[in-house]
Each structure stands twice: as C-alpha cells, then as structure tokens.
Curated annotation (Swiss-Prot):
It catalyses: tetracenomycin B2 + 2 NADPH + 2 O2 + 2 H(+) = 8-demethyltetracenomycin C + 2 NADP(+) + H2O; tetracenomycin A2 + 2 NADPH + 2 O2 + 2 H(+) = tetracenomycin C + 2 NADP(+) + H2O. Since tetracenomycin B2, the most likely substrate for ElmG, was not available, tetracenomycin A2 was used as a substrate to test the enzyme activity of the purified ElmG. FAD binds at L15, E35, Q128, L152, D313. The gene is elmG. This is Tetracenomycin B2 monooxygenase-dioxygenase.
Length: 539
C-alpha cells in the first residue's frame, strides 16, 4: 500500500472542502483533498454568495472569475419591471398563490445590495455547480492534491497526527495517509463526525424534501419579471421556486405534502407537481434532475476533536433560507486555514486551534437559528418570527468573535441586531478606501497573507516595532502608517474607528481586529511582542 505524508488531509470536496484547499495553499500549507463523488456537483442548493464570502474569494484572486460566472443581482424592488435581461436577477424573496398570478405576490424579504459602506465587493448569485469548479481549479493551480472518486476508508488519531486510509473508488487502490491534522468537510451525514461521536443540538429533522431541476420558458407568464425565490402558497401544492440560471429553475417541496417520504417521485410525477404548484398546468417542462434530501437543523457541540476539525455542513446544518450555509462553510474554512498555517509554520502553538471552535461555533449556532427563523417566517408570515430576524447584511458582515485570539473582546452574542464595525477587537476591520502607491485599496484587502499593523499618523513607533518583530520572529507582519505608506485624504479611518492619532490596529490574516491601542507606549516592541504571543497562544 502506498503511503503519503501531508500536513492536512481534507475529507469532502464540496464548497467548504475546496475552499479549505484554496485557503491552505494560499497560506503555503500542503494538503490532500479526497471526495467520494466523481466530480463537482451538477445541482445546487447554494447560490447566494454574500459580500463577506466574496471578500475572501477576492483576496484569493477569484472575485472577477466568480462575477463573470454569476447572475448579476439587482435591487429587489425592481422585480416587477418587465423585460429584464436574463442575466439580471432582483434579490427578492416572494410569496405567491401561484406563478400565473405573480403580480399579486407579497415581498417576504428584500435584502439590501447597498453594501458600499461595508465592503469593497458585493453579493453574487453564483450556483454551487459553477463555484465548485472555480475553487477546484484554483486549488489545483495553487498545488493542492485534489482526488475525486476517492473515499475515506478509516482514520485514527494520536497525539501527533492522524493516520487514514483512502480508497480510489475506480481502481480499488488503497493509500495510507499520515497527516498532522484532518478537516472533515464531508457534509450533513459526516462519517468523520459520526466516527468521532460528536453530539449536536438543534431542532432536528424538518422533513424529507425533493429538489427538481428543470428547464422551462416562463416568459408568457412572467413577461421578463425576475426574482431569486418565490414561496408558492398553494394549499394543494406548496413548494419553493428558485432561479437556477438564465433558463433553468429549481422547485423544492416537502415529500409529506405529496404522499410522504416513501412515495415514488419520478420525473413525470415531479413535473406534474411543479405545474400544479405554479398554477400553469399546460406549460412544457424538461426535468433534468430529481434529488432527494432532508432539511434539518443541527449544530455540532464541538468543532474540534483532537486533531480533527468539523467544517461546513459537517459542523452545522440548517434550512437554506438566507443562503447562510455555504457562506458559513467557506468562512469556517478561512478561519481554520490561517490558524493551521500559523501552527504548521511554527509561529503559534496548537492551542491557537482551540479558537476555531471558540469563534465559529457561536457564529454557526446563531446563523443556524436565523436560518430556521427565516424558513418558518417565509412559510407562515408570523409577525413575532419576523421581529426576530436580523438583517442579512448584519448576519453576513457583522458577526464578531470572542476568543483568546482577540484581545479585549467580550460580546454577549456573535451576531448583533444592528451592524457595528468600529475597529474594536473581534470585529472585521471596517471597510475604508485608502490610497497605496497611487492605487485605491480597502482596509479589508490589507491582511491577506499575514498580520497587518495599521497605525495612524503619529503611530510610527508602533509600525517600526512591527517591522522589527517581523524580522526577528518570522511572523508575517506588515506595517502601514496612514500618511506615509497609506494616504487617507478624507480621514475616513479615524471616522470609522475612532482611533487616536498615536494609535494602531492589529489585523489578523482574516481581516479581523485582534488588538488595538489608542495611544502610544513606552516600549511598543515589548507590548506588541506580548500581544502577538497571546494571540498565537505562545505564552
């Protein structure tokens, strides 16, 4: 049996696993990814990519590629406009009796696309079937070992690493893999999570469901109107219609509404269900794929078990309402990747990896509850549930961390009710446009491959200390002084953060503020050295 030694083994080649491979290679970490299916997915239950996830993809050099392959979201209020181009889609969620009477549809949710004050990029509508190949190709380009049609057969961990056996499903060839760490991104039914015996909490199963991918010309009914999702409030035939791409759609329904989970749902029956629910019984449909799945709400009680980490659906699963699932998985992967890199490159102790659970578990728990609340509210419109909803922009960009990897942060919740990005530790750095060598750059773009010390005009001693520490410790740490290496004519950074003239922010590789000082210090190098030691768990 062949044997491979690799720093990180990633199990699962969906969005989370492929993103992990990209981010690990971006941080200079070798990895092997195994995925039991032959290729990336042909169907999508994830299309909405929020602005925060786009920031991560932007920093990996993928923003333009994703935009080129996306439907372009426009303001939801424009959904009634006739004759819209097929590649434009209003970001709106509707509830309608049937599609034939779409003019009477009620707006259930209309997320704002106006994020220019929050992010250097914006949300996109890019199906999982398009995004997975983008991530796969980028991971391969960066040097990741990606193996589809390969399954994890077994694994066992010890104090120093993980021993696994993988099997090529085509040839039956078995390979022993020794890794320092394992990322389980193997989905809702994660075999790794089950083998570890990790328990979870949540509302449990919400029912067996079917997704029907089909092609149809709805122009005679819609007259160019477009929307992201419409909940069909047809008492005899309820379901959800989602735009897939320019000429294809996905219709989802709970099996219990049509005879139970054991009933046969072939393409012919599914086509009839779609026609009935949409109220247009004679329209031609080309059903291309029917996929059963189970909607559930479950969050793992622990995201870490020794040298194994749960990410994406393996860690948290919830209804698709809000498009939080794939976004959360990609953000899990990014949070974990820079921490693994810090440990594997000898810059941090293994204890830094405990902050993955400390940070991502509260976020995953609260996002799962938001998704469940949105799902229930969209179905019945209960006002009490509506009052519990947090704006999508806040959920996407406003989550914050309380952990030992941020100093001075103690938040009662991971997701605030109102957006607050003010440069405090535990928050993503507020987006401010600055000028660097004649080029406009966002503060969000500064910390890509390492830490960044961002000082105001009188904070040069902080920047000088950072430069010395980078040289002596090997920690990737770049220093910028506003007014010297960066210019800020509008003084926007001070307005956004309230940072003092002699103050500085320390940004982590994920763009979150790890520490701040509003004043100078007698020995800035000693202070900053101690700060980094605490963040990287070296003390």
């Amino acid at each position: 049996m062949d044997r491979i030694e690799i720093p990180v083994l990633v199990v699962g080649g969906g969005l989370t696993g492929l993103a992990a491979a990209v981010f690990l290679r971006q941080q200079g970490v070798d990895c092997l990814l195994v995925e039991r299916h032959r290729s990336t997915t042909f169907l999508t239950r994830a299309s909405g990519i929020n602005a925060r996830t786009m920031e991560l993809l932007r920093n990996a050099g993928l923003e333009e590629t994703v935009i080129d392959r996306s439907l372009h979201l426009i303001e939801g209020k424009r959904w009634r406009e006739l004759g819209q181009p097929a590649d434009r889609i209003p970001w709106v969620v509707l509830r309608a009796r049937d599609l034939a009477d779409i003019e009477r549809a009620v707006i259930v949710e209309e997320p704002s696309l106006d994020v220019a004050d929050v992010s250097p990029t914006r949300a996109q509508w890019c199906g999982q079937d398009k995004l997975e190949p983008i991530l796969r190709d980028e991971a391969v380009r960066r040097g990741a070992d990606i193996r589809f049609h390969t399954r994890l057969d077994s694994f066992a961990q010890d104090a120093d690493g993980v021993d696994a056996v993988i099997v090529d499903r085509g040839t039956g060839a078995r390979t022993a893999v020794r890794s320092r760490y394992l990322i389980a991104a193997d989905g809702v039914r994660s075999t790794v999570r089950q083998a570890l015996g990790v328990t979870g909490t949540g509302h449990g199963s919400l029912g067996k469901a079917m997704s029907v991918l089909f092609q149809a010309d709805f122009e005679p009914v819609l007259h160019g109107r477009r929307f992201v999702i419409t909940y069909m409030a047809n008492p005899q035939a309820p379901g959800v219609l989602q735009t897939f791409d320019e000429n294809r759609w996905i219709f989802g329904f709970f099996c219990d509404a049509y005879g139970g989970g054991d009933a046969a749902f072939d393409t012919g029956r599914c086509a009839d269900i779609v026609r009935t629910s949409l109220g247009i019984p004679d329209i031609p449909l080309d059903v291309q794929l029917v996929q059963p799945w189970e909607m559930s709400h479950h969050v793992a009680d622990s995201y870490r078990s020794g040298r194994v980490f749960l990410a994406g659906d393996a860690a948290h699963v919830h209804p698709p309402a809000g498009a939080f699932g794939a976004n959360g998985g990609i953000q899990d992967a990014h949070n974990l990747a820079w921490k693994l890199a810090s440990v594997l490159h000898g810059r941090a102790s293994d204890a830094l990896l405990d902050t993955y659970h400390q940070e991502r578990h509260p976020v995953g728990t609260e996002i799962a509850e938001q998704a469940w609340t949105r799902h229930t509210y969209r179905l019945d419109g209960d006002d009490e549930l509506g009052r519990r909803l947090v704006d999508t922009k806040v959920v996407a960009a406003g989550y914050r961390y309380t952990s030992s990897a941020v100093l001075g942060a103690a938040y009662p919740t991971a997701i605030p009710h109102e957006l607050a990005l003010t440069g405090l530790p535990g928050q993503r750095v507020p987006h401010v446009w600055l000028d660097h060598d004649g080029r406009r750059v966002s503060t969000v773009d500064l910390a890509v491959d390492g830490f960044v010390l961002l000082a105001r005009a009188d904070g040069t001693p902080w920047a000088d200390a950072a430069a010395r520490l980078a040289a002596t410790t090997g920690i990737p740490l770049t220093a910028h002084v506003v007014g010297k290496t960066l210019t800020d004519p509008a003084d926007a950074l001070a307005a956004a953060t309230g940072l003092g003239e002699a103050g500085a922010l320390l940004l982590r590789p994920d763009g979150f503020v790890a520490w701040r000082s509003d004043t100078s210090a007698d020995d800035p190098e000693a202070v900053l050295d101690g700060v980094l030691a605490r963040i990287l768990a070296r003390t």
